[in-house]
Design a protein with these regions (language model features):
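RNA substrate-binding interface of SAM-dependent RNA methyltransferases
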Residues: 7-11, 17, 23, 33, ...
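Short, acidic/turn-prone active-site loops that include or flank metal/cofactor-
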Residues: 26-28, 50-51, 125-127, 195-197, ...
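Short, glycine/polar-rich helix-capping loops at beta-to-alpha or helix-loop-helix junctions
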Residues: 30, 127-133, 197-206
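Short, hinge-like loop/turn segments at secondary-structure boundaries
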Residues: 39, 63-66, 136-141, 185-188
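Short glycine/serine/threonine-rich phosphate/pyrophosphate-binding segments
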Residues: 103-107, 199, 224
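Active-site/ligand-binding-proximal alpha/beta "capping" segment
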Residues: 168-223
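N-terminal positively charged helical leader segments and presequences
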Residues: 1-86
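Structured adenosyl-cofactor binding patch, chiefly the S-adenosyl-L-methionine
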Residues: 114, 119, 136-141, 201-244
């Protein structure tokens, strides 16, 4: 996996995922701390011309710094269930049903990391995987939150429900109530669907309740990454300083 830009490389180094670091001469002085930390960690350092980094990144922005490492380390669903039991009513998870755009996924993971989410669940099918584009879009923060890929999202939600979670689907329409009215005072899983399609029926049926974000301006909906950020930080606001 490639880590594009200094922030993504710093995060990968902290997680122990960085194997080699390519730095263009013009960027060397700007990342002296990263170079020192990487050298201390035994990471292979390579001073390469900008053209070499451009070829390696295949047109993606890298700011003169590019890292190589292993595949993204996904969490197991059992780890998330254990975290739920340990955190009790403060537990907060995010499940994504059919979010295929890597830029949206990266933005969502950045918000999830900022909100201190206990885990993000993705289906293996009909979903973007965590790759270089996602890590770049997350500003390098994708590894700060446990991300789990599952064969069957519905079964994963069933397992979290059995462990004590309350499943909320973010969806407008009949039977949905405003998220402003929900106290979020129990272990919570927020489920968001793809833009345009929304939640699939089998996922919708597994939800304990449906919530929507009011739109007084008259637009139909928010971008899925914006909706995720709004919903996550609403949960934190409702719980107060001791509920996160």
């Amino acid at each position: 996996m490639l880590f594009l830009g200094p922030h993504a490389c710093e995060e990968a180094l902290v997680r122990g995922e960085l194997h080699s670091l390519w730095i263009a001469p013009a960027a060397w002085g700007r990342v002296a701390r990263l170079v020192a930390d990487a050298r201390n960690a035994g990471v292979v350092l390579r001073r390469e011309p900008m053209e070499a980094l451009d070829r390696k990144a295949q047109g993606q922005r890298h700011q003169g710094v590019l890292g190589e490492g292993g595949a993204f380390a996904y969490a197991a669903i059992e780890d998330l269930e254990a975290s739920l039991r340990a955190r009790g009513d403060a537990a907060l998870f995010l499940a994504l049903d059919g979010v295929t755009d890597p830029h949206n996924l990266g933005a969502i993971l950045r918000s999830a990391a900022g909100a201190g989410v206990d885990g993000v669940i993705l289906p293996e099918r009909r979903s973007a995987a965590v790759n270089e584009t996602v890590i770049r879009a997350s500003a390098g923060t994708a590894g700060r939150v446990p991300v789990c890929r599952v064969v069957n999202l519905g079964r994963a939600l069933d397992g979290l429900k059995e462990a004590g979670a309350w499943i909320y689907g973010l969806a407008a329409g009949e039977g949905s109530r405003s998220y402003l009215d929900e106290p979020f005072d129990r272990p919570t899983v927020l489920v968001l669907g793809a833009e345009g399609e929304g939640l699939h029926l089998k996922i919708r049926e597994r939800c304990d309740g449906l919530l929507h974000i009011p739109m007084p301006g008259g637009i139909e909906s928010l971008n899925v990454s914006a909706a995720a950020a709004v919903a996550l930080f609403r949960v934190l606001a409702r719980r107060g300083p001791h509920g996160a």
